[in-house]
UniProtKB/Swiss-Prot annotation:
The keyword Chaperone does not apply. This is Protein S100-A7A. May be involved in epidermal differentiation and inflammation and might therefore be important for the pathogenesis of psoriasis and other diseases. One of its GO terms (cellular component) is cytosol. Overexpressed in psoriasis. GO terms for molecular function: calcium ion binding; calcium-dependent protein binding; identical protein binding; transition metal ion binding. It is found in: Cytoplasm. Its main location: cytoplasm. Ca(2+) binds at residues 63, 65, 67, 69, 74. Zn(2+) 1 binds at residues 18, 87, 91. One of its GO terms (biological process) is endothelial cell migration.
Length: 101
């Protein structure tokens, strides 16, 4: 039986996390910035147009345990923020409209 679209989406997020992690299974700041630029260029562009420099603060905001790395739960929190922004857009909000950003 093949995976559903939802299952493929989750597997894709896990694969994205693994692509940018180090040997310890966590993402360091340079890799997180690369991941954001490669995978969310439209989101970042919309934020930049509003004068919101998302990349300047995202690492510090998401590194909840302050270990200077992003673990999987912190990564999911980041994706949740981006998904929430796209959800707001589906209801007419402007891109990068705030909230948990």
């Amino acid at each position: 039986m093949s995976n559903t679209q939802a299952e493929r989406s989750i597997i894709g997020m896990i694969d994205m996390f693994h692509k940018y992690t180090g040997r310890d299974g966590k993402i360091e700041k340079p890799s997180l910035l690369t991941m954001m630029k490669e995978n969310f260029p439209n989101f970042l562009s919309a934020c930049d147009k509003k004068g919101i420099h998302y990349l300047a603060t995202v690492f510090e905001k998401k590194d909840k345990n302050e270990d200077k790395k992003i673990d999987f739960s912190e990564f999911l929190s980041l994706l949740g923020d981006i998904a929430a922004d796209y959800h707001k857009q589906s209801h007419g909000a402007a891109p990068c409209s705030g909230g948990s950003q």
